[in-house]
Amino acid sequence: MINRRQFSVLAGVAAAGTAVAACAPMATSTPSTPTPAGHTTFRSFAQVDAGLLNVGYAEDGPADGPPVILLHGWPYDVHSYVDVAPLLAARGFRVIVPFLRGFGSTRFLSDSTFRNGQQAAVAEDVIALMDALDIPKAVVAGFDWGARSADVVAALWPQRCRALVSVSGYLVVDLVANRAPLPPRAEYGWWYQYYFATDRGEAGYRQNTHDFNKLIWTNASPTWAFDDATYDRSAASFTNPDHVDVVIHNYRWRQGLAPGEPRYDDLERRLAAKPAITVPAITISSDFDGPAKDGAAYRHLFTGRYEHRVLDGIGHNVPQEAPRQFADAVIEVAGWS
């Protein structure tokens, strides 16, 4: 899920209390008719050694097409893009959709590698994948963890990022800002992060991963009538043996409760300065973003050609809930560069 301080830092503390209904532990809207996905799988899947990982990824489109890398979030997987990929492939793009570390068929190459979920580690995985696939430059797009990783790639490696599509805007984690408390209603919205901070939370997530993540799906997208088959296709990725360790570390690291690795210290120092994103970019917001929906608060952090789009009636999983709109953003921003 997104940065716990987004609503207060970006939209003001007073407004933050109303912004978190989508991720609060009790949903206020329950869809009555499940909506099946248009597609259920990808053209093909592959594996490649890349950096610290053996990365599993879905692919579509011509091998010589302009590359687009689509990054999923938590608790989701590559199937968030199952309807986006063929739309982009039909326009001639080479589409790569990797399972992030801790998801699906992606595995650590060494048992001794720390199961790190910090932002610099996940973003560096993207660069390693591009190197392994001999992709010098790509359009990078994502939501949730994937948007954060895409933002980091665009900010720290602009020479590798042709253009950017980021749901919820500028999501680079600010560890210092994360130390400050939010108003009670806003804190309530981030209940799962505090749950993960406890031994009980880690044990509970390990024991109930399937049902826990389905609850997050429902609460983050209260008007999306996904069916069980749609959820179960993604839920298979949560059985990855490293999934719980990576997820728990990610959220504890964000709260300053778990250290990152020294190898990423320089990257994190650069990210702490909130570097501007200079590449062409389209940001997308949805109902999940609450008072930050207009994107005004992070507009100054995008200094290249830029557009912000608002999708009303859509929850957090934008590419799966609104695949045409997401694909259109990728197609348009690619044309700017």
Feature names for model-found ranges:
Residues 36-43, 52-55, 60, 67, ...:
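Flexible "cap/lid" subdomain of the alpha/beta-hydrolase fold that forms the substrate-access gate
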Residues 1-15:
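N-terminal secretory signal peptides and thylakoid transit peptides that target proteins
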Residues 82, 151-155, 327:
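Short, hydrophobic alpha-helix immediately C-terminal to the catalytic nucleophile
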Residues 76, 172, 290-291, 316-319:
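Nucleotide-sugar-dependent glycosyltransferase donor-binding/catalytic pocket residues
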Residues 307-337:
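Catalytic active-site module of serine/aspartate enzymes centered on a nucleophile-bearing elbow/loop
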